[in-house]
Amino acid sequence: MTGHAPDAVWPSASPPPASPALTWQLHDVAELPGVRAQLRRNTTSESSDPDLLDQLILAFDEMASNALRHGGGRVQASVRLTPDSYLIVVSDAAASDPPRPAVGRDPSEGGLGLYLIAEMATEHGWYVEGGAKYVWALLPRR
């Protein structure tokens, strides 16, 4: 899928600067359908390509659901704008647990979200700040 080794941790790096965001405090994966609908409504005018908008929604959902399932609580998700990209940033309380793509797992068991996001993103990474882990991905919007 990517040029990275299958067991590679996402790169440790800060995201590029971006403008103010749509932000959500998340507590349960059951909230995600409503958040996806809000995200779609609020970003439709930012992208002229419906496929790019679909990729944004998919990447956001994968990142947010990973944080809710594995992040130890206190999940915040945001979508910010750069001149030509969407910046998705998701934080959780699992600061010592870097994002790791699933290795050696049957694809039917899931766990391919990080691979998918890395393929769609022009850049991606993670960093720790204030005791929280921040995972981010930059996706084109034009």
Language model features with spans:
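Charge-dense, low-complexity intrinsically disordered segments
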Residues: L26-V29, P50
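Conserved long hydrophobic alpha-helices within structured protein cores
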Residues: D28, P33-A37, V90
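Short, well-structured hydrophobic secondary-structure segments
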Residues: A59, A64-R69
